Amino acid sequence: MKIVTYSKNVFIPLTRNCRNRCDYCGFRSEEIGVMSAEEVRKILSAARGAKEALFTFGERPDEVYPEFKAMLLEMGYKSMVDYILEMNKIAVEMGFLPHTNAGILSKEEMRKLKPYNASMGLMLEQAVELECHANSPGKKPEVRIKMIRDAGKLQIPFTTGILVGIGEGREDRLYSLEIIAEIQDNYGHIQEVIVQNFKPKKGTPMENTPPPTLEEMLEAVKAAREILPQEVAIQIPPNLVDDIYPFLKAGANDVGGISNVTHDYINPESPWPEVERLERALRGEFILKERLPIYPRFVKLKWYGEALEPLIEKYSDADGYARP
């Protein structure tokens, strides 16, 4: 039987401030604020059974909000990256393996964060310019492609993906997947590709845009499986689709991070399913297996820093999956 993987995580949205203004986003906020170290510790303390600390938040807020920059300086940090690093270290101290998706980072910034991250991520979304990204400098395809390549040069286990239904066409989706495949052929660092469906959010410019159909999503998953190298997992977010089974039959083999203590702050209207419900959705045709935020292949290759070694050795089994 084929294996379907998932990770037990805790979601830490450090800030909703962001330099991008994407037409579909309901997460971004103008209210200046950042989670304190105490808040981060509190969330982590409540995260029973989780091994992954998922840090996802607005992109480069310190570059567009002078008040945000001033707040960081007052807290003793020169930049958001310095603050992220400190929060990553707290997570490691408390027994969690960080995965950071901070939006666009330079090669040097990723180099700085690498020792304290089991993996990192950045959605490609689409490799073409789209109207919904007109006010989002960080969503320029060439900027995102460069970062994904740079992560490969640094040998950082990496998550990327496509967002389906944001104004792109079928050919654009195929092109985006081909770009990811080409990067993987060169660097070998991409562990998973998320095929995510757009969901309209009230109060956004795209609130009346219809989401992609089930057929479009299944076709995108099939295309991803055909185009991407076999070692790359295809992830379908289980809280954004009604039934994961057809997607697994189409080629998906990962259901991402699942949390029993925090909700999906990007899609708050879509709660994560319980592991037991996921088990039932597999209909006895697949084996559900817990993994770490670093995939088994990279555990075996030791693509991680010394700071994470004790935790990875503690949490991983002989095959690189999470110990039961």
Swiss-Prot record:
Organism encoding this protein: Archaeoglobus fulgidus (strain ATCC 49558 / DSM 4304 / JCM 9628 / NBRC 100126 / VC-16)
EC numbers for this chain: 4.3.1.32
Gene Ontology terms for molecular function: 4 iron, 4 sulfur cluster binding; 7,8-didemethyl-8-hydroxy-5-deazariboflavin synthase activity; iron ion binding; transferase activity, transferring alkyl or aryl (other than methyl) groups
Location of the Radical SAM core domain: 4-239
Coiled-coil regions listed: none
Role: Catalyzes the radical-mediated synthesis of 7,8-didemethyl-8-hydroxy-5-deazariboflavin from 5-amino-5-(4-hydroxybenzyl)-6-(D-ribitylimino)-5,6-dihydrouracil.
Name assigned to this protein: 7,8-didemethyl-8-hydroxy-5-deazariboflavin synthase
Cofactor binding, note field: Binds 1 [4Fe-4S] cluster. The cluster is coordinated with 3 cysteines and an exchangeable S-adenosyl-L-methionine.
Family, per entry: Belongs to the radical SAM superfamily. CofG family.
Binding positions ([4Fe-4S] cluster): C18, C22, C25
Record's catalysed reaction(s): 5-amino-5-(4-hydroxybenzyl)-6-(D-ribitylimino)-5,6-dihydrouracil + S-adenosyl-L-methionine = 7,8-didemethyl-8-hydroxy-5-deazariboflavin + 5'-deoxyadenosine + L-methionine + NH4(+) + H(+)
Taxonomic path: Archaea, Methanobacteriati, Methanobacteriota, Archaeoglobi, Archaeoglobales
InterPro entries: Aldolase_TIM, CofG_family, Elp3/MiaA/NifB-like_rSAM, F420, rSAM
